[in-house]
Amino acid sequence: MLVGGCAHRESQYTPSGKHFTTDVMNRMTPVKDQGESETCWIYAMLATIETEHLSWGDSVNLSPYYIEKMIEQEANCPKTKRGEPTTLINMIEKYGICGYDAMRKPETPAPKWVFMLGAQYTPQEFARSVCKPGDYIALMSDDSKPYYETSELEVPDNWTHELYLNIPMDSLLDRTERSVSAHHGVCWEDKNHAMAIVGLAHDEDGEQYFIMKNSWGDSGPYGGLEYVSYQMFRSETIAVEMTKEAYSN
């Protein structure tokens, strides 16, 4: 499977000329801008983790630049720094994470300590407070593979060889919708891009949409949000990530 670039470009997700009514809107941190980088997977998965914590009442805003810098140490990381949202989970467990205020620009040195609520943590210690090993499950829907078994997602960006649970598309859409309705963070990806799902909506014709938080800045008519129809979800989704708790509910 060939995978295109996810750098900032004109959106092909939100249909024009539609009026959207919000049905569910989950809490989220401000929309960020990945610029010309190919690191949408970092932004999308961090945004998913942030929304998950905000739904608990926690305040967390994480730095994508920390992970961008850390993956330079990975021998298998491509020069483009492309990856999968599951790669982000793997890298957080290995290198930790820091808050956005500690590293707001790519040229900022990676901090050795994270200060939170008067306490001092290593980035790895802080990471375990925002994303414990085994918290998340990766899902895909590939009718050429057995359902309810795990296998690698066969795309070049999966350079850490993460495993995904393969389920039917109807089940994938249903579990995604239920998770968003229950205020969980969900990460979505197609063959070109990844975004965090933060809400649900419908248009004047009754067609249903997932509201997605993009990482191309807050310009545009919806302040950096995209409206992805259920029809597009069915045809374009290659994978979804959510907590195991969200999946089991």
Set out the residue ranges of the language-model regions.
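Structural recognition of the beta-strand scaffold that forms the well-ordered cores
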Residues: 39-42, 63-70, 88-91, 99-101, ...
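Cross-family signature of deubiquitinases and ubiquitin-like deconjugating cysteine proteases
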Residues: 7-10, 27-55, 70
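Active-site signature of cysteine proteases
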Residues: 7-11, 29, 113-249
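N-terminal regions that are enriched for targeting/export leaders
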Residues: 11-26
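Papain-like cysteine protease catalytic cores
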Residues: 59-120
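Active-site nucleophilic cysteine motif
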Residues: 34-49, 78-90, 193-194
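Second-shell loop/turn segments in exported
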Residues: 26-38, 74-80, 158-166
